[in-house]
């Protein structure tokens, strides 16, 4: 179960985000369901040459490519076409996680465009 909140706080959407291992454990796929807003799927495959995850997110006629790396306690996914656009798993624990869609400003500050607080249901 997830709560999707737009950065300006104008809208909160209840949804679901399902994760599973696919391709005999070689990849992780997820499906995100945000009713009346967005439905999408992501495929993450570890690249041994770059020591990072190659990521593709597809939704409603569009695909976004990213590269994911661990940075301290966070997992940071950077858009391959725009290094200022990032998706960040800020905090992950056994029961919940916190995700943010951010844009890096010219001064280096992160502008939060949207965030998700998710509770794990097993």
Enumerate the predicted regions with their spans.
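Hydrophobic small-molecule pocket/channel-lining residues, especially in calycin-type beta-barrels
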Residues: 1-122
């Amino acid at each position: 179960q997830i709560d999707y909140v737009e950065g300006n706080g104008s809208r909160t959407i209840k949804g679901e985000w399902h994760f599973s291992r696919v391709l005999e454990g070689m990849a992780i796929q997820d499906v995100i369901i945000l009713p009346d807003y967005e439905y999408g799927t992501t495929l993450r495959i570890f690249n041994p040459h770059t020591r990072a995850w190659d990521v593709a997110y597809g939704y409603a006629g569009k695909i976004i490519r990213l590269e994911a790396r661990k940075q301290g306690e966070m997992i940071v996914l950077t858009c391959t076409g725009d290094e200022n656009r990032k998706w960040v798993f800020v905090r992950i624990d056994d029961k919940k996680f916190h995700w943010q869609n951010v844009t890096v400003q010219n001064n280096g500050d992160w502008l939060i465009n949207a965030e998700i607080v998710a509770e794990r249901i097993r």
